[in-house]
């Protein structure tokens, strides 16, 4: 299973919109933009975090600088949305301040009708996964869109090998087991070659018929943070290992997933 070309957008509009009900836009303390890496304002936002969490701490205190460095690192780890080396190291960022995060957390805790802003933060990613996992992912129709590679048009265009299937946790139980799998792949490759030689659609139909559900398919998926929140909460303990990989990807690579997806408070070690 692979996750590639991930992009996240919509933080600025979503967090501005969450302040619409009380017209509290002047209280926003987040910064968004496109800057060279060395010019990013993460330390400015980090200072806001230090002052919000330690209001009695003097700016000249050594601890202030230590905390500011920690918050700046946390902001870089979460707030860098896109880094493009081909464009002179420009970085797209969304550094969320403590006031905006506090409001966001209160809205998320209040329920789905209040956390509408999560549905305005969009994620796009190319996922390569077996067909049996995609069947379960298709349960999530509302708010998600997927554009897949075509099994119908492209299945016969490349050789069929073991690498075409999900083998992340593949176990060779014994020689007989491995032999049967190898024979199945040889059979599928035979059908593919016969179709290419004869253009007889009956071979193509048999290839489709006997293709295992472990066949890897790539889809470009768009979804929002509310989708991620639902999926990760519902599938965290699923017996399919691919769901654990999905949850792990969200946890490790999706910006601010700890707070916006898993509901954890901002806590620095």
Residue spans for each PLM region:
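Family-specific signature for flavin-dependent thymidylate synthase
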Residues: 1-269
């Amino acid at each position: 299973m692979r996750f590639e070309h991930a992009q996240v957008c919509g933080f600025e509009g979503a967090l501005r919109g969450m302040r619409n009900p009380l017209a509290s836009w002047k209280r926003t303390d987040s910064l968004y933009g496109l800057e060279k890496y060395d010019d990013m304002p993460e330390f400015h936002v980090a200072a806001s975090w230090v002052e919000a969490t330690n209001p009695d701490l003097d700016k000249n205190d050594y601890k202030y600088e230590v905390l500011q460095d920690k918050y700046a690192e946390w902001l870089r780890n979460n707030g860098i949305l896109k880094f493009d080396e081909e464009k002179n190291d420009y970085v797209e960022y969304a550094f969320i301040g403590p006031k905006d995060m506090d409001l966001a957390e209160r809205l998320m805790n209040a329920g789905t009708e209040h956390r509408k802003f999560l549905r305005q933060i969009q994620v796009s990613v190319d996922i390569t996964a077996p067909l049996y996992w995609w069947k379960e992912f298709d349960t999530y129709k509302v708010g998600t869109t997927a554009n897949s590679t075509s099994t119908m048009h492209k299945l016969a265009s490349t050789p069929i090998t073991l690498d075409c299937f999900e083998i992340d946790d593949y176990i060779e139980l014994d020689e007989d087991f491995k032999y049967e799998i190898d024979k199945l792949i040889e059979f599928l490759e035979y059908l593919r070659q016969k179709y290419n030689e004869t253009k007889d659609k009956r071979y193509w139909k048999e290839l489709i018929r006997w293709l295992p559900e472990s066949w890897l398919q790539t889809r470009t998926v768009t979804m929002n943070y509310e989708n991620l929140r639902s999926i990760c909460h519902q599938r965290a303990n699923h017996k399919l290992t691919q769901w654990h990989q999905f949850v792990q990807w969200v946890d490790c690579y999706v910006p601010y997933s700890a707070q916006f997806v898993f509901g954890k408070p901002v806590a620095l070690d």
